[in-house]
A protein has these predicted regions:
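Glycine-rich flavin
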Residues: 2-8, 24-31, 36-156
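Glycine-rich Rossmann-fold phosphate-binding loop(s) that bind the pyrophosphate
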Residues: 14-17, 38-39
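Residues forming the Rossmann-fold NAD(P)(H) cofactor-binding site
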Residues: 20
Length: 156
């Protein structure tokens, strides 16, 4: 069963960097906005790419500095990296950023909808959620679904 249509000035498919930035800006311009994400808002950069990678890179830089601390006149002994603690550090950074982003989206009045979206026609988006299907009527639609790598089956 499809619920009644909800009308929006802008519906955005994909809650990664481009999608959430567009949603926040459109909301600031007084548009009624729905942002649809099938996973967690923030996309690859926040959850699996840029942010967690940089957090772990920071751990490596600190480890390197501790190992070379004698050159700074600091006496210490490097005993290795506790990977469980490093992963916990990384997860904490990702979680704080995700919560901050979610709060900002909510504060700007964007309707964040968790589900799988499909274009029904030029002004209608159907969203499959855990609660059922929604139909959203949109004056404008942005496709910000990102990309996924695909192997081409050639050995290199």
């Amino acid at each position: 069963m499809v619920e009644s249509k909800n009308s929006y000035d802008l519906v955005i498919l994909g809650g990664g960097t481009a999608g959430y930035a567009a949603a926040i800006r459109a909301s600031q311009l007084d548009m009624k906005v729905a942002l649809i994400e099938r996973d967690k808002v923030g996309g690859t950069c926040l959850h699996r790419g840029c942010i967690p990678t940089k957090a772990l890179l920071h751990v490596a830089e600190v480890a390197h500095s501790v190992r070379d601390s004698k050159s700074f006149g600091i006496l210490s002994e490097f005993q290795g990296v506790d990977m469980e603690a490093a992963i916990k550090f990384k997860d904490g950074i990702v979680d704080r950023n995700h919560k901050g982003l979610s709060g900002m989206i909510k504060a700007d009045g964007v309707d964040l909808i968790s589900g799988e979206a499909k274009l029904k026609d030029q002004s209608t988006v159907t969203v499959s959620t855990d609660e059922g299907e929604l139909e959203l009527d949109a004056k404008n639609i942005i496709l910000a679904t990102g990309s996924e790598p695909k192997t081409i089956g050639i050995e290199i």
